[in-house]
Amino acid sequence: YWDATTQYCGTCGSPMRINTGISKLCDKCHREIWPQLATAVICLVHKGDEILLVRAHNFRGNFHGLVAGFVETGETLEHAVEREIAEETGLTVRNIEYFGSQPWPYPNGLMVGFYAEYAGGEVHIQEEELKTAGWFSIDNLPVIPEKLSIARKLIDNWLLRKGRTAE
């Protein structure tokens, strides 16, 4: 994707060539460029034996997932977690814990997963982003994302911490 969309220099319009394994160079103006990442965070918010699950308008299929969103320029990953949860659900969180990351099937995407404890607030969804949001107990989980997704890996790992597994 990156190679196909960076054939010409954005400064002078001349053809770009591979310079290193991860950069391109313009021979005319000597501008060097690297792939840009679109970094997003995703977070499993837990409260006792319950987790916060959402249904976003852009979800394909009838499943519930986790709050996620893009990191803004100049923002830490942890602040992005707090901001996205507050914006989409009205909740506050604490004790944010890194889980892992996964390349995301959005061009140049990287999804970074976290856990966070519920700190306060009532669920009030951002209707432009979400259809529904709510707390679900270990024993009453709805349809959740596919096993290959980082959302599912977060959920499965949380269930293992609780001595359980997903159906």
PLM regions: where:
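N-terminal strand-loop-strand
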Residues: 20-66, 70, 92-93, 116-118
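Cys/His-rich microdomains that often coordinate metals
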Residues: 13-16, 33
